[in-house]
Amino acid sequence: ASKKGSKIHYVPPYRGETRLQLAGWLGLAVDRLKDYVSRDLIRAIVSMREIKQPEEIAQLEEVAQTGYRMHTAAMAMCREGLTERDVAAELDRIAAAGGGRTSFRSIVSQHGETLHNLSYDGRLENGRLLLIDAGAENAMGYASDHTRTLPVGGRFTEKQREIYDIVLAANARGQDLARPGVTYQSVHLEAMRVIAEGLTQLGLMRGDPAEAVAAGAAALFMPHGLGHQMGLDVHDMEGLGEKYVGYDDATTRSTQFGLGALRMGKTLKAGHVVTVEPGIYFIPALIEKWEREHIHSSFINFPKLRSYFDFGGIRLEDDILITATGNRLVGKHRPPIAPAEVEAAMTR
């Protein structure tokens, strides 16, 4: 085809051996492959894979049940004296027993403020929060992805419950708004407004919540996006490039801190499967940096935040299918999420 002058279409190769093979065929240096990928082919693949067919939805429903068992088992075993590694090992065991494996390396951490903390060295301590971001992958390769945050010892403190309720409200708001014709970027911003409003009521933020979100101030507490597509990859098709998977000509990626980390921003369509995963994190180094540099000081009550430096973080993540009229949860059973449900699951 190359000798005939025909255009050769390929997508960004993922595996190392494929990169070497393709570079050899095309006579290119490996680091030049990215310069000649076919945007037409990428867009065609995205358009087919992003709309989940009934057979795919059935696979996602199946693996979601394994994810449910993983999280409820973690809740039942979460107690002082165990290690984060003990919980992670049980998640691995249940995923394997379900016929597959975990869909990514599980996050099991009492330092929820570290967004992708893959260390399992901590020993569980009463009064602390344990953030568990974990999912399963089934034999067909389809993935689940849920996050729950648990109070070690089985009961939320009043301070923890205040923050938890804000995150839960943001999760609910995101699910209320997600439907065909709505950009997920707008859903993200509304979830952020709920977070800013709740933190303002607690005195941790000040001013108008909508203005704080527009300015990017609320991203101090949630420096990531509301969600991403799911399917055969837990971050579905991410290797093809988020600007094609999560964005399009009508919706471009923001450069603003926090909002720019949103992986899925474009208009939702029936058949999309996306995560809804708001969070609130108290990251001492980031808070101190913003305070030192007077970043958004009109919106943030820095002195009051010092009493939250040992808080950690809370994230609550569900997987939803966009339907013709709105959305629904993927999976027959939702991992416990209301505070009373979580506490009950931890005392069985």
Question: Where on the chain are the PLM-derived regions?
Answer:
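Active-site neighborhoods and metal-handling regions in enzymes and metal-associated proteins
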Residues: 1-348
